[in-house]
Amino acid sequence: MHDPIADMLTRIRNACMARHATVSIPSSKMKLAIAQILKREGFIQDFTVQEGKPRNTIVITLKYTPDRRPVITGLKRVSKPGLRIYTKRADIPRVRGGLGLSILSTPRGVMAGHEAWQQRVGGEVLCYVW
């Protein structure tokens, strides 16, 4: 697999469209950090890490509105292995007029765009969530 983060976003997108309750994703530190941000910002209900022999797995519990519409309506991978996208603090993008979220990989770790702006750091724009 060339882009594990894109794979994670695609699995979440497909599970939301199919109205699944949970989705399983192979674990890594970066994916765990992204899942923590999605939970903290209210886009997913919860996540757990299941220990496994060959590899640990992240099980994400998706969040839906009372009328069974997914809270996550869109996910977009921005910086890709073939074309990295970096941004300064002043240029951190707002997603959907502030209704969405940008996730950045900074020297201080993976964080949401508004957190990076508050901490005055820029970094690699991993993805947008809305």
UniProtKB/Swiss-Prot annotation:
Identify the InterPro entries for this entry. Answer: Ribosomal_uS8, Ribosomal_uS8_sf
Q: Which GO terms describe its molecular function?
A: rRNA binding; structural constituent of ribosome
**Domain of life of the native organism:** Bacteria
Gene Ontology CC: one annotated term: ribosome
Listed A to Z, the keywords are: Ribonucleoprotein, Ribosomal protein, RNA-binding, rRNA-binding
Any one GO biological process: translation
Q: What does this protein do?
A: One of the primary rRNA binding proteins, it binds directly to 16S rRNA central domain where it helps coordinate assembly of the platform of the 30S subunit.
Q: How does it assemble?
A: Part of the 30S ribosomal subunit. Contacts proteins S5 and S12.
Q: Which family does it belong to?
A: Belongs to the universal ribosomal protein uS8 family.
Tell me which PANTHER family the record gives: 40S RIBOSOMAL PROTEIN S15A
Mind telling me what this protein is named? Small ribosomal subunit protein uS8
Q: Which lineage is the organism of this entry classified under, starting from the top rank?
A: Bacteria, Bacillati, Chloroflexota, Chloroflexia, Chloroflexales
